[in-house]
């Protein structure tokens, strides 16, 4: 049990003491997935049968309790105020923005990492977006299975492929449309933050889709998607997999018109990620009216003084932030005045008075 009723929480301790587990638990209650693994079985202690997370929070001056449990039999129970609920409703209660050392590799990571970042941010603003992603994946898997059977020579009605492609077009076009729209909105905020940190550099975000050439309207995207599926139909049948769609797209970052992934220094890339994370915090607050909890997982030690100072000064009194660090040396005394500090050692956590 841990009381996080202060606006600013600092958890200090050596590595492998459990600091990250606390942030992961908070994040889990907002995303229903771990930031480090896609297999929820891995969050269960080796000697336990279930994983349970309970939290009480105040939202709009009203107390709300969240209860999550997951068993090794893959049984999941979600409750809000003691009443069972759906994943969609559960995830609407708590919003978080996680900034960890892994995020610093966002620009040079896999396209799937950048898609996950974008999708996670969008889903906190538009709860139905998660359902579209799930629906798209189900249709895509069904199509891939159909193509695998087809390549084996199993006699199948190929009109089913046309039906699946049309379903992919409708659902996938909606996903792409929302991604492009959100990216344009967050770019406006991120450009300004990036300009302040870097002083002179201009940031640009580009949604990279193989079959689009600047189209942004839903009908245009759907038409292009439909055409791309038809154009690559033979290739997909030969490879037995879906070759085009939002599951193959990427997000490109440019600094002064140069692609950051290829040409930016480590410091420049970290400036981009810092601007993105703080912009994510702002846009979620602006769109939903809910201030997300900012989770900073050992990330300050990886930033230079300029970026550290900008990050800490960006944390307003309205923002609840939970920070993990090996010690308090990175923080100015003025910042620490309003911070509740906990120390964790050997799995035990105590408040520093």
Predicted segments, located by residue:
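Nucleotide-state sensing region of NTPase/ATPase domains
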Residues: 30-107, 111-113, 117, 122-125, ...
């Amino acid at each position: 049990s841990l009381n996080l009723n202060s606006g600013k929480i600092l958890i200090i301790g050596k590595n492998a003491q459990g600091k990250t587990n606390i942030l992961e638990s908070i994040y889990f209650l907002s995303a229903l997935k771990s930031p480090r693994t896609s297999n929820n079985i891995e969050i269960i202690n080796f000697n336990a049968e279930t994983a349970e997370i309970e939290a009480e929070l105040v939202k709009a001056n009203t107390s709300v309790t969240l209860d999550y449990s997951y068993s090794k039999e893959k049984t999941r129970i979600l409750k809000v105020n003691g009443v069972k609920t759906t994943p969609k409703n559960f995830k609407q209660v708590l919003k978080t923005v996680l900034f960890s050392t892994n995020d610093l590799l966002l620009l040079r990571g896999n396209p799937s990492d950048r898609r996950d970042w974008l999708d996670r941010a969008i889903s906190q603003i538009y709860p139905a977006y998660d359902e579209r992603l799930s629906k798209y994946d189900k249709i895509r898997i069904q199509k891939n299975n159909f193509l695998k059977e087809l390549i084996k020579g199993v006699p199948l009605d190929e009109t089913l492929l046309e039906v699946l492609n049309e379903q992919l077009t409708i659902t996938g076009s909606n996903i792409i449309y929302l991604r492009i729209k959100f990216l344009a909105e967050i770019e406006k905020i991120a450009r300004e933050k990036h300009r302040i940190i870097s002083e002179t550099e201009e940031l640009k975000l580009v949604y990279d889709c193989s079959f689009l050439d600047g189209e942004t309207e839903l009908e245009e995207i759907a038409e292009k998607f439909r055409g791309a599926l038809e154009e690559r139909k033979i290739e997909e049948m030969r490879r037995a997999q879906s070759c085009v769609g939002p599951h193959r797209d990427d997000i490109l970052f440019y600094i002064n018109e140069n692609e950051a992934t290829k040409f930016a220094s480590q410091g420049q890339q970290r400036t981009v990620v810092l601007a993105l994370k703080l912009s994510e915090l702002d846009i979620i607050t602006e769109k939903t009216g809910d201030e997300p909890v900012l989770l900073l997982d050992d990330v300050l030690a990886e930033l230079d003084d300029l970026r550290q100072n900008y990050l800490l000064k960006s944390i307003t009194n309205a923002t609840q932030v939970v920070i993990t660090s090996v010690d308090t040396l990175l923080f100015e005394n003025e910042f620490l005045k309003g911070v509740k500090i906990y120390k964790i050692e050997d799995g035990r956590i105590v408040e520093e008075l």
